[in-house]
């Protein structure tokens, strides 16, 4: 999968979204036996808003909030920061297991205050096994990923890698040593690169982060989609650097 992606990268300048919409379907080419799409999202930048919520749709376009718009998973029970952002959900290949990944972040602590992500696994969409991974703690010997330098592990998503036989998780990394000057002498432009890891079989751990894609400026919110007709993977992401001065 990694080699195929690096052979052909396609950029898509996407607007930032509050959540990650994904049909809870197996990632296969077979016709779907399922009738609805589940949207996992967070609603706003407050601590109450930064919690997992669900919405349901029959067509993938029009959604109705579930649980009267209230959280379905309390962030203070799963996140080190007691808040989450960017939930991404998918149905596993076995058709019975659901996986969800998200950013472990509380935005009122600042946009450069996030050091990790969350892995979750469930068979009923209600009761979740969860693991919060703090990168400086999990990878203490990895250069540049110390708590002083690392400031963002954003918007994780997963995709099954057939060649490796594991789920690949990919996410945006922001580090202070990558920042570059702007016309404002008091401001440096944040710089993000897309990284990836592989998730353990029990969905509780990840391998050491590896570089997936360096756009040459800040690239966030990656989304990898397989095109079965062309038999290729396409990477969409948001350009957070050239198109705008992002002062967070």
Feature names for model-found ranges:
Residues 27-153, 159-248:
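Beta-rich carbohydrate-recognition and catalytic domains
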Residues 10, 14-22:
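Hydrophobic helical h-region of N-terminal Sec-dependent signal peptides
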Residues 1-5:
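N-terminal secretory signal peptides that target proteins for export/translocation
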